[in-house]
UniProtKB/Swiss-Prot annotation:
This is Venom nerve growth factor 3. Expressed by the venom gland. Homodimer; non-covalently linked. Residues 1-18 form the signal peptide. Residues 48-69 are annotated as: Disordered. Residues 48-66 have a biased composition (Basic and acidic residues). Residues 19-125 form a propeptide. PROSITE patterns: NGF_1, NGF_2. GO terms for biological process: cell surface receptor protein tyrosine kinase signaling pathway; modulation of chemical synaptic transmission; negative regulation of neuron apoptotic process; nerve development; nerve growth factor signaling pathway; neuron projection morphogenesis. Its main location: secreted. It comes from Demansia vestigiata (Lesser black whip snake). Glycans are attached at residue 147. Nerve growth factor is important for the development and maintenance of the sympathetic and sensory nervous systems. It stimulates division and differentiation of sympathetic and embryonic sensory neurons as well as basal forebrain cholinergic neurons in the brain. Its relevance in the snake venom is not clear. However, it has been shown to inhibit metalloproteinase-dependent proteolysis of platelet glycoprotein Ib alpha, suggesting a metalloproteinase inhibition to prevent metalloprotease autodigestion and/or protection against prey proteases. SMART domains: NGF (SM00140).
């Protein structure tokens, strides 16, 4: 009987000594490691699900190239818009090339190649220099071709001017020949050649109306718009000089 008790006690002590002391000693495939693996997988799945939902709520921004392509879409213009002479103006030019430096006194036209452009560059920009007869301009002006995106129409309302015009699968740019004053006072007293003892004077830019191709929504149409077209001298009599 005593031997049996000793045997049971020794077996009990051996079992206690052989038991694992911590989870670090748990072999792979045991219930403890299985629970850890399941927990890790669940956390990973939840993280992926959260990330996917975030991407759906905040989609990736479009590439800059895509945005530029969308904004560069041109309105196709009916060629019939250019068949009426009353819409033509020598100060409006549609060209695929940069326009000549100065206007060549011609009606609205299309320049499609470099040869046509070179034929129009013969006339250079002039700032009203002294000529052979000793004549001077009262005011100094400068004339250049410009692009316009907005303007004021004949009713005084702002309008959108078409810069790019898609005509017969060719993209033209719309240019305007503007003239403006170089300096409001070409001489210290004001305008050149004005008797400053009796007159006040200064140079100012004036505007006139030309037909331009404008757009409203997706529709293109001709409208009168104001552009700078001249530099004139304004004079007023000095008080007390009668």
């Amino acid at each position: 009987m005593s031997m049996l008790c000793y045997t049971l006690i020794i077996a009990f002590l051996i079992g206690i000594w052989a038991a694992p002391k911590s989870e670090d000693n748990v072999p792979l495939g045991s219930p403890a490691t299985s629970d850890l693996s399941d927990t890790s997988c669940a956390q990973t799945h939840e993280a992926l699900k959260t990330s996917r939902n975030t991407d759906q709520r905040h989609p990736a921004p479009k590439k800059a190239e895509d945005q530029e392509l969308g904004s560069a879409a041109n309105i196709i213009v009916d060629p019939k818009l250019f068949q009426k002479r009353r819409f033509q103006s020598p100060r409006v030019l549609f060209s695929t090339q940069p326009p000549p430096l100065s206007r060549d006194e011609q009606s609205v036209e299309f320049l499609e190649n470099e040869d046509a452009l070179n034929r129009n560059i013969r006339s250079k920009r002039e700032n009203h220099p002294v000529n052979d007869h000793g004549e001077y301009s009262v005011c100094d002006s400068v004339s250049v071709w410009v692009n316009k995106t907005t303007a004021t129409d004949i009713k005084g309302k702002p309008v959108t001017v078409m810069v790019d015009v898609n005509l017969n699968n060719h993209v033209y740019k719309q240019y305007f020949f503007e003239t403006k004053c170089k300096n409001p006072n070409p001489v210290p007293s004001g305008c050149r050649g004005i008797d400053s003892r009796h007159w006040n004077s200064y140079c100012t830019t004036t505007q006139s109306f030309v037909k331009a191709l404008t757009k409203e929504g997706n529709q293109a149409s001709w409208r009168f718009i104001r552009i700078d077209t001249a530099c004139v001298c304004v004079i007023s009599r000095k008080t007390g000089n009668f």
